[in-house]
Amino acid sequence: MGNLPGTRESRRLLGTHVLTEQEILANSRHADAVAYGGWPMDEHVAGGFRAKGQIPSRVRSFPGLYTIPYGCYCSGNIENLMMAGRNISASKLAMGSTRVMGTCAVGGQAAGTAAAMAALAGLTPAAFGKTHIRQLQQQLLKDDCYIPGLTNQDPADLARAARASASSSRPGFGPEQVLSGIART
């Protein structure tokens, strides 16, 4: 709960990347993407309920999805700190989209997976992100995460060589999507 009724955000941490509203509106695809969002930017007035005479909120919709880079989850000044949820590194307007629970959940899974993999590799999250981002992305896909624009590239994954069929399917959502690592768009 916010510290002021009617506000939907609290503190934000500064990461190695700050996601902006321009990136969201452009449906940006980042090379180090580990999560995604698609909720409209829901901007609430800074004063909350106390802001009399102001429009309480403004919604900016956009088509498609955007990706959230790893740098939004890694602290920019504390080497061994990661964040997830409503405190990721994003501008105030970008936070209007990233703060919804579905987006927070996929980001939390990415941050948790990265922290575990970094610990196993004996690296800080920041160092891990510089050298192991592809490995992290492939692990997230293997764990049934969706990252727009990324496909399963794991040569050891037998699903890549498998053949899938179904008696019926929705156009564009055939059984082959299960094998590609892109099961939903």
Which functions belong to the PLM regions below?
Residues M1-R160:
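Flavin (FAD/FMN)-binding glycine-rich loop and adjacent Rossmann-like elements that form
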